[in-house]
């Protein structure tokens, strides 16, 4: 049952094949069994069981709230959850109990979803590995998959060689990939949803900026943050998006226009569409496997009757440095509120003056990555530097936005790009570079989308020669999220990405292959 | 992209009639003259020509002072600028704080429509250019009563720019000449108020009250066109009246709804401007004038003694009447301004630009607000002068007290007495009684109708003016009697019987031959003495003019 998609399990609930409480308990038990993944910071067992009980009552009375009623979900630990600890994986917010729910959380709960827990991340979502949180790194479930174990070298199978999930929403990606929930919320500022989705073999969707409320999401970069969605298939993402999207009076950057329903056609059609391949995304660092899959994917579209053309996004090479300036500047500003006075950590060390209290609190509360970004951001915002850094970066951001505007204006419907440079790497490999370098490398294909506010989705495509997931990214026009997901659904159907085979879960019958997806996909190496 | 989203927060009341204006509170004594009391009072403290009074010594130039003001006015609104928390003065600490005001992570600002309307109206009333598009910025500094670590303000593109404020100043020995002056307005911006820190030095702790945090402020920045404390105080007073008339702010300085910072420098005319100091948090007009004049004099003295002026922030010690450097540990602040990313640009419309399909709740039309502007104080004064033939200074006096104009107009409506008489009674007798007991107009025991009835009796010559004063005093006791009742109870009616009066006059003439002799000798004071004697004999119930007429006839003058 747990291996099914959200839509499948939803219909099982409706037909009474399983009750919400049974489903909830199965997930809770799997969460316990996969504790070693460190995907969850908080497991909200009591809350989830209570919610399941209420959901069950509704089903019994024939008053189900809809597709999400009774569906176990997980939420990244940077979304505020009323009465449930929300830490951002930081000492600064350990023990912080928000008094309110983020709008997206509330909307899930209003539809009857069961909140299984809060998932792990890089501290304040600053990172691309889910390795830099105060609760330790998240382990990629594929490390323990039959596919990886069979194909990777012997030495890679030692316990110390576990793989990272990517980040910063690695906990949510791992939670969905390991079947502990049917959908999870992440956040995406520079790729934080799409990157771990690619490494964990899930769908990872970043909606258009302004489509989904950020109220209650503890911000990284307000002008780029969006709540992201992890699911095991594109249809499931559309279901969740349908619940989350729409104007929120508490977030003035959400659009007022009424949101159309996000049901995708059962037989999506991409013939007649124009698929753009940005030539700047073909970089030397791109792994040959991904490069080859990218090219095969383009062929698939062409074979279906889509027009595939090379397009030019000329300012792409300036994007990452521009992102760095804008990101750290907003970080410096957003982190100013963590001063130990109103909530969160307060240093017990030095109480001689308010300034000393601030300094000690912030020294103890933040990790080096956060502190580093605060320092650079404040540097860029200094009066003497503002024009040269912040304003210039904003101008470059405009150029990058215009690149996309021009491409989409020229008739391109969707862009097809890689999501990451490589497959997931072992933790020991990953930490050889610092967070800043890693973020710059890992966000290379993803952050420009955030600067432009466009919708984008990672679709898992195939397993690498080592048996690890590889994803490709589709980027759509602003607010054409439904069109993007339709294309993604068609693409997903073509590639037939294999289901992860987690040995210990297979053994106890939690995961019985049910839809024949365990066969290799059409895009294999 | 996203449209600006506005909340509705309607004002508690449009007119601040019930509030007692602080400067009238500060006034004391019952010397109520016909001109603006404010100006008169100021003249005793402000020494307007202080700096020019410096007699230039040999080889020296005169000094000129340059004063600019930044005025923060709390917007009169039910809720805060970016949150739904209520706005209310003197509520229990931290009882009016939303999650946003406490800067809980993940909360976002939502702009209050009412605050925007107040800002546009203030901009229009102050002859500003209203920017159809304005932006919000973050201004960063760490302070315990600023929970987010930044204030949202309008640094780059404020809602209104380039206006002017006309105010009046009194010249001449008796301040009887009124001249108008103009100060340019650089800009008006919307911004958040901070919370309040209360330092408990004994226990060395700081208590924080966030009730004020996030209340909408209008920051009005005046160009440095002022030259002394009196000018500054008069300009601020006029601004205060305008904001109150608009209902944009209650602008009560004693309650901190209007706070003024002054930038002050001195230089020799024709030479470059001097280094300026900033005097912060002046919370009464009297202290504003005092602080500015003290600071001007301090700078002149400093420079003449070969010292230099530091670009620093000073505070005014009202007990000692001087300005002192403020302790500023951080030294020069770099506020690291940054665009507020959570608020789209604030877009305003006019009649021609309102999009046809726009949600009316999301549209603010400048033209519509212009149509809604109430009569402004300057126009009211002009109207009073035109309509009632009033002296300009009387029109100032009527507007200078909260509620006094309304009181005056209500008396006018109900009485047959001449407007001039009403003006005199309201500004002299009535206001004098209020001041004496330190009461606001709204607290007066005498209603406009009661005064109107009294003035009718006076107008119809039923009572003398001295009897009228007596009746007014009775009315003030507030025992519920009407003027007519008091007159009849105390037998204060004038003797209408001319024969009886003639008899009284005859008797007085006969009883005071010496005075009569003086009258015949053309001693000008004698006739008045005789009139006085008759009045006394009539127990003040005779009309002096009539007595004089009869006496003159009898003595065949």
Swiss-Prot record, chain A:
Q: What class of enzyme is it?
A: ligase
Q: Does the keyword Ligase apply?
A: yes
**What function is annotated for this protein?**
Allows the formation of correctly charged Gln-tRNA(Gln) through the transamidation of misacylated Glu-tRNA(Gln) in the mitochondria. The reaction takes place in the presence of glutamine and ATP through an activated gamma-phospho-Glu-tRNA(Gln).
Active-site annotation: 76, 168, 192
Keywords, in A-Z order: ATP-binding, Ligase, Mitochondrion, Nucleotide-binding, Protein biosynthesis
SUPFAM superfamilies in the cross-refs:
Amidase signature (AS) enzymes (SSF75304)
Q: Which GO terms describe its molecular function?
A: ATP binding; glutaminyl-tRNA synthase (glutamine-hydrolyzing) activity
Q: Name one Pfam family in it.
A: Amidase
Q: Which reaction does it catalyse?
A: L-glutamyl-tRNA(Gln) + L-glutamine + ATP + H2O = L-glutaminyl-tRNA(Gln) + L-glutamate + ADP + phosphate + H(+)
Q: What is its EC number?
A: 6.3.5.7
A Gene Ontology cellular component where this protein is annotated is:
mitochondrion
State the oligomer form and interacting partners. Answer: Subunit of the heterotrimeric GatCAB amidotransferase (AdT) complex, composed of A (QRSL1), B (GATB) and C (GATC) subunits.
**Which compartments does it reside in?**
Mitochondrion
Check the record and name the InterPro entries matching this protein.
Amidase, Amidase_dom, AS_sf, GatA
Kindly list the biological process annotations in GO that this record carries: glutaminyl-tRNAGln biosynthesis via transamidation; mitochondrial translation; regulation of protein stability
Q: What is this protein called?
A: Glutamyl-tRNA(Gln) amidotransferase subunit A, mitochondrial
Q: Record keywords: Disulfide bond included?
A: no
Superkingdom of this protein's organism: Eukaryota
Q: Which family does it belong to?
A: Belongs to the amidase family. GatA subfamily.
